[in-house]
Regions:
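Residue-level recognition of tetratricopeptide repeat
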Residues: 13, 51, 55-58, 92, ...
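TPR/TPR-like (Sel1-like) alpha-helical repeat modules
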Residues: 31, 129, 138-158
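Helix-start (N-cap) detector for alpha-helical repeat units in TPR-like alpha-solenoids
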Residues: 5, 41-43, 50, 83-85, ...
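Residue-level detector of the short coil/turn that links helix A to helix B
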Residues: 19-21, 57, 64, 98, ...
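Canonical tetratricopeptide repeat
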Residues: 3, 10, 48, 89, ...
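Short coil turns that delineate tetratricopeptide repeat
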Residues: 1-2, 38-40, 81, 115, ...
């Protein structure tokens, strides 16, 4: 079974390397692997599957793939994979699917668990910005999250990290949240 799981992952990776033209095949391979292998192998294939769903959503503009990715990440979390990356991806997808209250709930928990990770505050700023816009509220909380994200991000930049979403957040802070 280990070899079969590796074979599915490798075949899916080859599809990913070829590019967007093979996304459907990559998704089908990973789903087939999940169906064929015992439940214990779900987590070994699911992260790759969720990533493929996200790329397919970007390539097609179809939010159904984001929902598939969200369900996949939520199952990963339910299966005990509670890493920062899995939980951040859940919050990011909830944000993209306009479920701002659920995204905020996840991000508040992440803030407690990872108080020094700029990505948590980046997404808190995005989500709070949407909530403030909907509620006609001042952007005080949003700017607070943004400032914390920017400060923590500067430390990451010193070690060579670049995050284009932080550029987007900078633009939003300058243009929308004053």
């Amino acid at each position: 079974n280990d070899q079969l799981a590796r074979a599915y992952r490798l075949a899916a990776s080859i599809c990913e390397d070829i590019g967007n033209s093979m996304l459907s095949e990559e998704i089908n391979l990973l789903n087939q692997g999940i169906e064929q292998l015992p439940d214990g192998y779900y987590n070994a294939l699911a992260g790759q599957l969720a990533s493929a769903y996200i790329r397919q959503a970007e390539a097609t503009g179809n939010p159904g793939y984001q929902k598939d990715a969200l369900r996949t990440y939520q199952q990963l979390e339910k299966n005990g994979n509670t890493t920062l990356e899995v939980r951040l991806n859940i919050a990011m997808l909830q944000y993209q699917l306009h479920d701002f209250s659920k995204a905020m709930e996840m991000l508040q928990a992440l803030k407690d668990d990872y108080p020094k990770d700029y990505r948590v505050y980046k997404w808190l700023a995005f989500v709070q910005g949407e909530l403030d816009l909907q509620n006609g509220a001042s952007y005080t909380k949003t700017l607070g999250y943004y400032e914390t994200a920017a400060e923590l991000y500067r430390a990451e930049q010193a070690s060579g990290v670049y995050d284009p979403q932080m550029d987007e957040l900078d633009r939003m802070a300058r243009n929308n949240w004053q």
